[in-house]
A protein has these predicted regions:
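Auxiliary, metal-adjacent structural segments of Zn-dependent hydrolase domains
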Residues: 1-40, 84
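Post-HExxH zinc-binding segment in Zn-dependent metallohydrolases
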Residues: 11-15, 65-85
């Protein structure tokens, strides 16, 4: 996990979210108000969800569907960067 935090810090992201392993979750993972719920141990998934925490720290909650889609695309790009590293 320290590798994940170092990677995110290099992108000026210092998440404070709590990660909750939830084996019976329908989705792989999701972020909600400071908590990442996940059934995955894939660190790329964790990177993606923690990025959402940093987005919320910087900008607050998404104000509409367009902003939510923009943030999702950005988190996906960060996840791809992690996978390529």
């Amino acid at each position: 996990m320290s590798d994940v935090l170092a990677f995110l810090a290099a992108l000026d992201c210092r998440p404070s979210a709590v990660i909750v392993q939830t084996p019976d979750l329908r989705r792989v993972a999701y972020y909600e108000h400071g908590t990442v719920y996940t059934r995955s141990t894939d660190l790329a998934v964790i990177v993606h969800e923690l990025w959402h925490d940093c987005q919320r720290q910087r900008l607050g909650d998404a104000w509409d569907a367009e902003e939510q889609a923009r943030r999702e695309a950005e988190a996906h790009r960060v996840e791809i960067m992690w996978r390529a590293d």
